[in-house]
């Protein structure tokens, strides 16, 4: 046997309720010893692991308060109970055959697997009242081959990891608890949904603020560029005025400087041509 054993099919097989149908049909037309025999056959049948429909048969319900109430209580035990409950009060039930005891142990494993997906060997040994690990592993493997659980045995850590567990019968009155549990789950979902909606509204509001800020910053940049462009244009015009200004304020321009010297080219000759009169 390897240290880790992966067991079970990938998908659960056909519902075990179909195997119970023939016993329900027999119970409808049986009374007395014949009915008790039908119940014992159902308890020993290798493919029957649910008993709710058989318990609901009128002929079976009549056994509850009669001299054969142990058969009813035993059927009730297999539908909802565990092996430890049987061991605690064996006088309440009919004497179980080895096949019946093993089936009740298998059903006990199913009950544990429904509550937790990781089950220590120590808990299984206690619930099944087994003191031998090899015997325990054999019981688990038989339950897996019966297709009521799928899982993996970790022998080093002594843990059964459950991947799938068949459901058991729902006890009378338990439906109300299921409704309450589902309602609590719905309320929790509503609360989470409201919280998510609030977060979405907050995120949208923050997004709107960021868009507004982005538009404002972009507009500020556009305005700043306009101001800078205007200042640059004014500076260029001022520089042009400073460059041409002296020629228009009474000073001599370059063209004038070139022309004026020609009038004073020979001052002496100009003086000779002057006539004086007395």
UniProtKB/Swiss-Prot annotation:
Residues with Phosphoserine modification: 233, 235, 238, 249
Role: Component of the COP9 signalosome complex (CSN), a complex involved in various cellular and developmental processes. The CSN complex is an essential regulator of the ubiquitin (Ubl) conjugation pathway by mediating the deneddylation of the cullin subunits of the SCF-type E3 ligase complexes, leading to decrease the Ubl ligase activity of SCF. The CSN complex plays an essential role in oogenesis and embryogenesis and is required for proper photoreceptor R cell differentiation and promote lamina glial cell migration or axon targeting.
Residue ranges of the region described as Disordered: 233-278
Source domain of life: Eukaryota
Entry keyword Isomerase: no
Protein family according to the UniProt entry: Belongs to the CSN7/EIF3M family. CSN7 subfamily.
InterPro entries: COPS7/eIF3m, CSN7_helixI, PCI_dom
Cellular localisation: Cytoplasm; Nucleus
Subunit comment: Component of the CSN complex, probably composed of CSN1b, alien/CSN2, CSN3, CSN4, CSN5, CSN6, CSN7 and CSN8. In the complex, it probably interacts directly with CSN2 and CSN4.
Keyword vocabulary terms for this entry: Cytoplasm, Developmental protein, Differentiation, Nucleus, Oogenesis, Phosphoprotein, Signalosome
Domain PCI: 1-167
Major localization class: cytoplasm
GO cellular component terms listed in the entry, alphabetical order: COP9 signalosome; cytoplasm; nuclear periphery
GO biological process terms on file: COP9 signalosome assembly; female germ-line stem cell population maintenance; germ cell development; germarium-derived cystoblast division; male germ-line cyst encapsulation; protein deneddylation; protein stabilization
Domain commentary: The PCI domain is necessary and sufficient for the interactions with other CSN subunits of the complex.
Listed name of the protein: COP9 signalosome complex subunit 7
Keyword match Cytoplasm: yes
């Amino acid at each position: 046997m390897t240290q880790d054993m992966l067991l079970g099919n990938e998908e659960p097989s056909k519902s075990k309720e179909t195997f119970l149908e023939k016993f329900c049909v027999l119970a409808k037309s049986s009374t007395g010893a014949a009915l008790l025999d039908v119940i014992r056959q159902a308890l020993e049948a290798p493919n029957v692991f649910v008993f709710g429909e058989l318990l609901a048969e009128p002929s079976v319900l009549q056994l509850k308060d009669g001299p054969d109430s142990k058969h009813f209580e035993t059927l009730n035990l297999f539908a909802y109970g565990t092996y430890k409950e049987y061991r605690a009060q064996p006088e309440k039930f009919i004497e179980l055959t080895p096949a019946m005891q093993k089936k009740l142990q298998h059903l006990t494993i199913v009950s544990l697997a429904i509550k937790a997906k990781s089950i220590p060997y120590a808990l299984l040994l206690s619930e099944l009242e087994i003191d031998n690990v090899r015997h325990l592993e054999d019981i688990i493997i038989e339950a897996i081959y019966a297709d009521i659980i799928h899982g993996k045995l970790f022998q080093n850590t002594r843990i059964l990891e459950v991947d799938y567990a068949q459901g058991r019968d729902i006890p009378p009155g338990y439906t109300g608890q299921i409704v309450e549990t589902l309602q609590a789950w719905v309320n929790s979902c509503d609360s989470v949904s409201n919280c998510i909606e609030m977060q979405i509204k907050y995120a949208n509001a923050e997004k709107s603020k960021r868009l507004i800020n982005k538009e404002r910053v972009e507009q500020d940049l556009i305005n700043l560029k306009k101001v800078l462009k205007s200042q640059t244009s004014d500076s260029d015009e001022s520089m042009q005025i400073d460059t041409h200004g002296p020629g228009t304020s009474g000073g001599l321009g370059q063209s004038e400087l070139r022309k004026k010297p020609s009038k004073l080219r020979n001052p002496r000759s100009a003086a000779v041509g002057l006539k004086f009169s007395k």
